[in-house]
């Protein structure tokens, strides 16, 4: 019984090894196309100023203005 469990465990590791890769960045880039090219989470590449009543704000100034 213990030997059978060991064989199933090794077979599972083999299957996981076949479907995974050491190059994880390429896989994530395929899952989320353009995510890394646009600056990632921060969105630095997509910066656009916010225009309110003809005056231009960046997102931090707009957030501070909303608080006060």
Swiss-Prot record:
Horsefly salivary gland immunosuppressant protein that likely inhibits the host inflammatory response by regulation of anti- and pro-inflammatory cytokines. When tested on mouse splenocytes in the presence of LPS, it increases the secretion of the proinflammatory cytokine interleukin-10 (IL10) and decreases the secretion of the proinflammatory cytokine interferon-gamma (IFNG) in a dose-dependent manner. The keyword Acetylation does not apply. The lineage of its organism: Eukaryota, Metazoa, Ecdysozoa, Arthropoda, Hexapoda. Keywords: Cleavage on pair of basic residues, Secreted, Signal. It is found in: Secreted. One of its GO terms (cellular component) is extracellular region. Transmembrane segments: none annotated. It comes from the Eukaryota. Residues 1-24 form the signal peptide. Residues 25-38 form a propeptide. Expressed in salivary glands. This is Tabimmunregulin 12.
């Amino acid at each position: 019984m213990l030997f059978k469990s060991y064989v199933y465990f090794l077979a599972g590791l083999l299957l996981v090894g076949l479907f995974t890769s050491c190059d994880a960045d390429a896989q994530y880039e395929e899952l989320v196309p353009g995510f890394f090219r646009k600056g990632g989470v921060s969105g630095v590449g997509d910066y656009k100023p916010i225009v309110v009543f003809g005056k231009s704000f960046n997102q931090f100034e707009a957030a501070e203005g909303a608080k006060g």
